[in-house]
Amino acid sequence: MKYPLMPLVNDLTFSFLVFWFCLPVGLLLLLIIWLRFLLSQDSEENDSSVCLDWEPWSKGPAEFCWKGTLHGQEKERPCW
């Protein structure tokens, strides 16, 4: 097999090939950094707005009773 008359990588094509080989890697790194930034920003916002009261869950099923209205009813629901 004979070699091509002009090599694939020379002074003219080297920068072109480096650009097209490095572009996907650079875009992938940029995408990873951007997604990590978005995920960290989302978790910071959710931490400040979420307030969970775990006290009712620590009680037994007979001790916890929901005292509120259901679908606009005025009287409270009885405890079990």
Swiss-Prot record:
Q: Which domain of life is it from?
A: Eukaryota
UniProt gene name: ADIG
Could you identify this protein by its name? Adipogenin
**In which compartments does the protein localize?**
Membrane; Nucleus
Coiled-coil annotation: which residues?
none
For biological process, the GO terms are:
brown fat cell differentiation; positive regulation of fat cell differentiation; spermatogenesis; white fat cell differentiation
As for membrane topology, the entry says: Single-pass membrane protein
Q: Which UniProt keywords apply?
A: Membrane, Nucleus, Transmembrane, Transmembrane helix
Summarize the protein's role.
Plays a role in stimulating adipocyte differentiation and development.
Asked if the Swiss-Prot or TrEMBL record annotates the protein with the keyword Membrane, the reply is yes
* Assigned protein family: Belongs to the adipogenin family.
Q: Name one Pfam family in it.
A: Adipogenin
Q: What is the lineage of its organism?
A: Eukaryota, Metazoa, Chordata, Craniata, Vertebrata
GO cellular component terms, A-Z: cytoplasm; lipid droplet; membrane; nucleus
From which organism does this entry originate?
A: Homo sapiens
Where are the membrane-spanning stretches? 14-34
Q: Does the keyword Nucleus apply?
A: yes
Q: InterPro entries per the record?
A: Adipogenin (IPR027938)
